[in-house]
């Protein structure tokens, strides 16, 4: 599957998302042979905004303004430390938004004090739909917690399975390596393709959506293999990083077969995190006159 061009609008969190809402009603209203769904991805910088202030209420408001049914989050702290008030950031955001949550830690460290919660950092999925199953897959990583790391399999590639008006959907959330040398990202893309192919074969007919911070721009050679099987739903939208004055598009919604992109945008949210979110309206195309 090649990268396709779509019709897009540049959005502001304050109000322009309504234009997408008119074009694609909430998923609960799906009828006929296609089911509408709004998905988003957001690197939340562990709850800290581009102004250096930790403020979960502000981030919850930014997430709520997206009006998304499913949101992938990166840089999520769960009792990680003082920078996020030792809070379960994934759980706190889910509670504020009234959504289900699945957290997939990349790192899970012993507590500072005996009997305390483990210190964890990773990715998460927020969903308005019940989460039928969840898996934390391993992909190649170069640990930031080791003094002399070597590339090795490590967790933090999250997957949840949902059913949206009868259509099974596999949602994956990822955060690829940030280093200038693309070698680890090359391995991570290969791992991602292998895992998604295996999961697709295990649940025939499931639609697939990949949400994440890829730490590379769309034309980066290491992302090329990914676009053989997935569409970059954000083609034509604006840059996402850094949030205050973005110059790079490194945050993505990518979709597989049976998922049609209806519109996408990068809301002009410049303060709640150091990245801007990406929001996409899709239609889950049914295979026939009945449900899958």
Model regions and ranges:
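Conserved beta strand-loop-helix elements of the APE1-like EEP
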Residues: 94-97, 118-134, 246-260, 283
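Metal-dependent phosphoester-hydrolase catalytic domains
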Residues: 161, 183, 196-209, 215-292
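Metal-dependent phosphoester/phosphodiester hydrolase catalytic core
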Residues: 163-185, 190
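Active-site environment of divalent metal-dependent phosphoester hydrolases
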Residues: 48-49, 78-81, 109-112, 179-181, ...
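Active-site-proximal beta-strand/loop segments in catalytic clefts of secreted hydrolases
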Residues: 42-45, 73-76, 104-108, 128-129, ...
